Swiss-Prot record:
It holds the Pfam family EF-hand_8. Residues 72-107 form the EF-hand domain. It comes from Arabidopsis thaliana (Mouse-ear cress). Ca(2+) binds at D85, D87, D89, E96. The keyword Metal-binding applies. It comes from the Eukaryota. This is Calcium-binding protein KRP1. GO terms for biological process: cellular response to hypoxia; response to auxin. GO terms for molecular function: calcium ion binding. Gene3D superfamilies: EF-hand.
Length: 130
């Protein structure tokens, strides 16, 4: 697995980049509130200080400086912004950023799905059919 500082970019031979999802580990160690706090800290590292949101320019600049991802193309940065930009304003606010981080974590999404399913089953008396 690649470290967070050196993700492997997709190639024809390897269409999927190597990626290790650290969010479940962070959630386990920090708890829910601690994880959200850390995501908010990450947001602040990437945001444009004057606008209070992550813009194309701030992500481009800070991804290189803070995360060591200087090899991102403009298209990579545009896609990253577009992926989480729910209100279509061309930037990520703090809520959009945190939601995006959860959506991009397969393990956290699966755990959330299981939790919601369990609550629904308990609330409405449903049982799983195999």
């Amino acid at each position: 697995m690649a470290s967070p500082k050196s993700p492997t970019r997709p190639t024809q031979q390897n269409p999927q980049p190597n990626f290790h999802d650290f969010l479940p580990t962070m959630a386990g160690n920090l708890g829910g509130e601690g994880l959200i706090g850390e995501l908010c800290n990450g947001f602040e590292l990437l945001m444009d200080r004057e606008k209070g949101v992550i813009t194309f320019e701030s992500l481009r600049r800070n991804a290189a400086a803070v995360l060591g991802l200087g090899d991102l193309t403009d298209e990579d940065v545009r896609c990253m912004i577009k992926e989480g930009d729910f209100d279509c304003d061309g930037a990520l606010n703090q809520m959009e950023f945190c939601v995006l981080m959860f959506r991009l974590s397969p393990d956290l999404m699966e755990a959330s799905r299981c939790l919601v399913t369990e609550v629904i089953e308990e609330e409405f008396g449903f049982t799983r059919r195999h």
